[in-house]
C-alpha cells in the first residue's frame, strides 16, 4: 500500500487527511526505520508494508466506528513503536493518549517521535502495566484501553480492565480469531466484572483477516487485581 493508496482509501471512508497529517505519517515512517537500526522496534520496515500493516492496521478502531475525534482518555498497553494509538492520534487529534511500556529505549523513541510530529496530549511512562494499574493516578481513569497483538484475552483482561472507568471499553486488536480464547477468558472477565460486547471481523486491503474484541467494564475492579508483575502471565485467572 503506497502512501497515496493509503490516503485514497481513507478518503473513500470519509477521512480526508490534511497535508500536515500526511507529513506526520511520512515522518513517522522515517523515524521508525531510522530508530529500528538502533533498537528493535519492528520486523516490518518496507514503506508500503509499514503503511498497510502498521498505519492502516492501527486505525482500524476509527474505521470500524469504535473511536472518533473527541476528547477521550485512551491508554495503549504494549504499544511498542506506538501502535495502534499514535496513528489514531494523528487522525483524531482530540484524543488524549497515554502509553505504558516496559522498555525505556522504546519510551525514548516515542517521546522523540511525539515531539517531531508535534503531537500534544500524549504521555509516556516506563514500567509494568501491573504496577501502574495499582496507582490511583492511573486506575479507573481511562475511557478506552487499546492493545494490539499483546496477549491472550485471559491475560490481557487482567492487565487492562483495572485502568478503565466503569462503562469504559477495552479494544483488543488481533490477527486471529480463536473462539476458544474468549471461552478461556470467561472466568477472568467475570472476576473483573467485564463483558465481551462485540467481536468484529474485517480484512486489510490485501485480504489479511483482522479482529477487534470489544470488552466493556461493568463494575469497579476488585482491589486485588491486577496481581503482582508477572503473575497474570504465569497463572492466568
From Swiss-Prot:
Cite the EC number. Answer: 2.1.1.-
Location relative to the cell:
Cytoplasm
Q: Which residues form a coiled coil?
A: none
The disulfide bridges present are none
Query: Per its UniProt entry, what is the enzyme's top EC class, as one word?
Result: transferase
Which Pfam family, giving just one, matches this sequence?
Answer: GidB
Q: Which Gene3D superfamilies match?
A: Vaccinia Virus protein VP39
Quote the InterPro entries the UniProt record gives: rRNA_ssu_MeTfrase_G, SAM-dependent_MTases_sf
Q: Where is this region: Disordered?
A: 218-237
Keywords assigned by UniProt, alphabetized:
Cytoplasm, Methyltransferase, rRNA processing, S-adenosyl-L-methionine, Transferase
**Tell me, what is one Gene Ontology molecular-function annotation carried by this entry?**
rRNA (guanine-N7-)-methyltransferase activity
Q: Where does S-adenosyl-L-methionine bind?
A: 78, 83, 129-130, 148
SUPFAM superfamilies found in the cross-reference section: S-adenosyl-L-methionine-dependent methyltransferases (SSF53335)
Q: Which GO terms describe its cellular component?
A: cytosol
Database matches in PANTHER family: S-ADENOSYL-L-METHIONINE-DEPENDENT METHYLTRANSFERASES SUPERFAMILY PROTEIN
UniProt similarity note:
Belongs to the methyltransferase superfamily. RNA methyltransferase RsmG family.
- Per its database record, what is this protein's job? Specifically methylates the N7 position of a guanine in 16S rRNA.
For this entry, the protein name equals Ribosomal RNA small subunit methyltransferase G
Species in which this protein is naturally found? Streptococcus sanguinis (strain SK36)
Organism lineage reads as: Bacteria, Bacillati, Bacillota, Bacilli, Lactobacillales
Amino acid at each position: 500500500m503506497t502512501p497515496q493508496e493509503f490516503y485514497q482509501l481513507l478518503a473513500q471512508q470519509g477521512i480526508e487527511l490534511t497535508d500536515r497529517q500526511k507529513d506526520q505519517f511520512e515522518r513517522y515512517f522515517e523515524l521508525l526505520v531510522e530508530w529500528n537500526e538502533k533498537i528493535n522496534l519492528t520486523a516490518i520496515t518496507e514503506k508500503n508494508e509499514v503503511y498497510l500493516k502498521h498505519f492502516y492496521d492501527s486505525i482500524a478502531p476509527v474505521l470500524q466506528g469504535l473511536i472518533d475525534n473527541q476528547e477521550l482518555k485512551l491508554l495503549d498497553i504494549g504499544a511498542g513503536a506506538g501502535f495502534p494509538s499514535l496513528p489514531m492520534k494523528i487522525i483524531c487529534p482530540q484524543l488524549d493518549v497515554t502509553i505504558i511500556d516496559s522498555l525505556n529505549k522504546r519510551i525514548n523513541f516515542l517521546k522523540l517521535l511525539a515531539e517531531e510530529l508535534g503531537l500534544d496530549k500524549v504521555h509516556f511512562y516506563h514500567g509494568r502495566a501491573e504496577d501502574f494499574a495499582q496507582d490511583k493516578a492511573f486506575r479507573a481513569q481511562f475511557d478506552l484501553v487499546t492493545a494490539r497483538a499483546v496477549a491472550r484475552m485471559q491475560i490481557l483482561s487482567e492487565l487492562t480492565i483495572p485502568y478503565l472507568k466503569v462503562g469504559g471499553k477495552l479494544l483488543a486488536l488481533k490477527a486471529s480469531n480463536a473462539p476458544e480464547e474468549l471461552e478461556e477468558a470467561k472466568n477472568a472477565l467475570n472476576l473483573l466484572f467485564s463483558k465481551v460486547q462485540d467481536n468484529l471481523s474485517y480484512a486489510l486491503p490485501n485480504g489479511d483477516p483482522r479482529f477487534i474484541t470489544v470488552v466493556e467494564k461493568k463494575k469497579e475492579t476488585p482491589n486485588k487485581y491486577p496481581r503482582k508483575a508477572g503473575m497474570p502471565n504465569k497463572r492466568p485467572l
